Curated annotation (Swiss-Prot):
It comes from Rhodopseudomonas palustris (strain BisB5). Its main location: membrane. NDH-1 is composed of 14 different subunits. Subunits NuoB, C, D, E, F, and G constitute the peripheral sector of the complex. This is NADH-quinone oxidoreductase subunit D. The keyword Cell inner membrane applies. It is found in: Cell inner membrane. The keyword NAD applies. InterPro entries: NADH_Q_OxRdtase_suD (IPR001135), NADH_UbQ_OxRdtase_49kDa_CS (IPR014029), NDH1_su_D/H (IPR022885), NiFe-Hase_large (IPR029014).
Length: 416
């Protein structure tokens, strides 16, 4: 019996150049995320290149909130420059003022009175809670939880009232001065902050009950946006972005400034470097901030915590109104200070503080005049945003907003 001939496989014909040109080729899809996207945290525009639902490339377009802050500061006296820093990270304004005041004080070689240091640290920790409350709750909102922002804003409202009672302004406080703070805190305000600290711990516990073990929240954040410690150092990360990857790096401990060396607090660190670890860190940092605030309040009430809230030199710090009504010399000092300002010795200095978003630095150059020659601002969010490309690569489109929420970006300081 003759075998049936084997079926020959059809030979593939190489397509001609004309046919290849006519065939629709596969290409990635490019979309705009923002600048009016609800999860964009301000005026962010991301150009995303997608392969289906998978992110291939992220291109952040910044500058939509650029106001030329660094250049404007060069044309203002050192006193007039302070309010510009409130408008950088406008979620926690006083932390930025702190860096600038420390830089000028270092050039002038002056020491701030102890009570002023305690007030500064107290309000910087209030700023940290303001920032973390907003971030943790909006990060939850970005992945679909709508209750946390309502709770968070209720507490932020109380903190903004503390800002207002100290400085007269809810957001742009301009409360810190070179040489101290503008006014002393009334005893009742200190008592109210103390009682708020006790009640706030319960709010943090309630937020954790809603989110920390929530199955949906964990699915959206665990193993998303993983950053190794090596990558964190390479990209110039700081703050929670470094601590989430396992490094106990906090300027309040490693390079203590003001009276942080006296404070007893812990530095929480993560081990996976993902969005969930960064969320857990911010929640724990709020608890540590409460610890620091309680210690500050106890020290403010102690006998050695009394006294002046600014230096005595009226050539640098404005004289009190009562003095001006009695002394012609004080009136002259006041007039000179607000018209001409004070002169800072020639030199350059870099001062960094542990702001809620990371290391906020001020590189200040003085030419001996009454205005800064150059004031370079090192914003932590700028370094974090530039890493969006490598963090988001390979993730789904829905993960982009979760990653963005965990980076904690505020555009005042990125665009400045």
């Amino acid at each position: 019996m003759a075998e049936a001939p084997m079926a020959q496989a059809p030979t593939a014909q190489a397509p001609t150049a004309e046919a290849a040109a006519e065939a629709p080729g596969l290409r990635n899809f490019t979309i705009n995320f923002g600048p009016q996207h609800p999860a964009a945290h301000g005026v962010l525009r991301l150009v995303l290149e997608l392969d289906g639902e998978v992110v291939e490339r992220v291109d952040p377009h910044i500058g939509l909130l650029h106001r030329g802050t660094e250049k404007l500061i060069e044309h203002k006296t050192y006193l007039q420059a302070i309010p510009y820093f409130d408008r950088l990270d406008y979620v926690a304004p006083m932390n930025q003022e702190h860096a600038f005041c420390l830089a000028v004080e270092k050039l002038l070689g002056i020491a701030v009175p102890r009570r002023a240091q305690l007030i500064r640290v107290l309000y910087c920790e209030i700023g940290r809670i303001l920032s973390h409350l907003l971030n943790v709750t909006t990060q939850a909102m970005d992945v679909g939880a709508l209750t946390p922002p309502l709770w968070g804003f209720e507490e932020r409202e109380k903190l903004m009232m503390f800002y207002e009672r100290a400085s007269g302004s809810r957001m742009h406080a301009a409360y810190f001065r070179v040489g101290g703070v503008h006014q002393d805190l009334p005893p009742q305000l200190v008592a109210d902050i103390d009682s708020w600290c006790d009640s706030f711990i319960q709010v943090v516990d309630d937020l954790e009950t809603l989110l920390t073990d929530n199955r949906i929240f964990k699915q959206r954040n665990v193993d998303i946006g993983v950053v190794t410690l090596e990558q964190a150092w390479e990209w110039g990360f700081s703050g929670v972005m470094v601590r989430g990857s396992g490094a106990a790096w906090d300027l309040r401990k490693s390079q203590p400034y003001e009276c942080y060396a006296e404070m007893d607090f812990d530095i929480p660190i993560g081990k996976n470097g993902d969005c969930y670890d960064r969320y857990c860190l911010r929640v724990e940092e709020m608890r540590q901030s409460i610890r620091i605030m309680k210690q500050c309040i106890a020290k403010l009430r102690a006998p050695d915590g009394q006294g002046r809230v600014a230096i005595d030199d009226n050539k640098i710090f404005p004289p009190r109104r009562g003095e001006m009504k009695r002394s012609m010399e004080s009136l002259i000092h006041h007039f000179k200070l607000y018209t001409e300002g004070f002169r800072v010795p020639e030199g350059e200095v870099y001062v960094a503080v542990e702001a809620p978003k990371g290391e906020f630095g001020v590189y200040l150059v003085s030419d001996g005049s009454n205005k800064p020659y150059k004031c370079k601002i090192r914003a932590p969010g700028f370094a974090h945003l530039q890493a969006m490309d490598f963090i988001c690569r390979g993730h789904l489109l829905a993960d982009v907003s979760a990653i963005l929420g965990s980076l904690d970006i505020v555009f005042g300081e990125v665009d400045r």
